[in-house]
Amino acid sequence: MKKQILILCNLIFLASAIDAKNLNPGFNIVEYQECICMASHFKELPGIEEKYLAPNPKLFEKLYSSPVMGFENAWELWQSADSIAAISLRATVTTMNSWLSNFHAGMVKAQGVCHFGKDINYKLCDNPDAMVHSGWLTSMLAMSDDILAHIDSCYKAGIKDFIITGHSQGGAIAYLLTAFLIEKKSSGFLPKDIQFKTYCSGAPKPGDYAFACEYEYMTRNDRSLSVVNPEDWVPEVPLSIQKINDFSKTNPFAHTNELPDTLGFINKIKIKFLFKSISKSPRKAEKKLRKYLGTKVGNILEKEYDTYQKPTFGQCANYARTGHTIIFKPSTAYYERHPQNSKDFFEHHMYRSYYELSLDCDY
């Protein structure tokens, strides 16, 4: 009898931790644990050993698993007893094309047209100069029609609160999907009373600094949480290359040809030479990244997918993190289980690692 009462009390506590009538802003540890558990239990998650997985979700039930779409992408729809829907986006799997989506890191405009089977018009933010990762954008857009159709079905069934979540590649796509859906809501395509809240777990950088600023404004008031294990290298990629012309338009570096005469002729020459030498290496590095991770990977994907047409890539690789960052600081006990010098370079990135950290965090 005591055991039954204890179980009942635990269920009441867990259910009250997520309030469907008001999907509150800010980090909620129970919500996050459900998200990492959902990410860990896709219908098809090949090549992942049991020891790397988190437990099954406690509060959410799986309603739908999508077919494979885009560059070996998939998503699932979950629902809680309190009528919160969760859109869970799959992480990278072991297939070549799934990894090519990650490596297709040339940047494209955050608004435009994607050519994959059909022309897909998209807008992720208002800033026409903002740029995002090409591979993950294409992956998101390939799933977008299916996701929108299920959001519509949920809304007609009375569900208005949606959690968007993903781990690793799924987290990167979750950023872009969130921006896409917020713009759909702003344009009137989606109802105004729909609420979105996002948990990106162990996610890479989705776009440039301009997009990061736009995204953080769009999800202000703690509507998008980015959970990071500081020992995990994945949130540090793609590599960021900042050029002089990546700065905001009003900056001192744009006017080195207009230095005041009070500096003197020799000093002006020295300053111009310094800026020229500093800016040369980033320009070359960005150009090389665009060539290989944009054009060449795009060529491979065009051969893999007859209906895919690679985009025109922007001259930018100024990748930046975004969202409200939640740091899971590892404890001594964590390091005993997951050593820093592990030969497994995904040791600190897997579902189990993040789940264990969530049990120790003091949020």
PLM features: residue spans?
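Active-site signature of alpha/beta-hydrolase-fold catalytic machinery across serine-
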Residues: L176-F180
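N-terminal low-complexity, Ser/Thr- and acidic-residue-enriched intrinsically disordered segments
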Residues: K21-I84, R90-T92
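A conserved cap/lid and substrate-binding interface adjacent to the catalytic center
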Residues: L63-F162, S187-L190, Q195, N221
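Short, glycine/acidic-rich beta->alpha junctions
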Residues: M69-G70, I173, G207, T219
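Serine hydrolase/lipase
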Residues: K21, K118, D145-D161, E183-Y363
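Short, flexible loop/turn elements at secondary-structure junctions
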Residues: Y64-P67, A81, A91-V93, S168, ...
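Gly/Ala-rich beta-loop-alpha elbow adjacent to hydrolase catalytic centers
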Residues: G166-G170, A174
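Bacterial Sec-dependent N-terminal signal peptides
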Residues: M1-L23
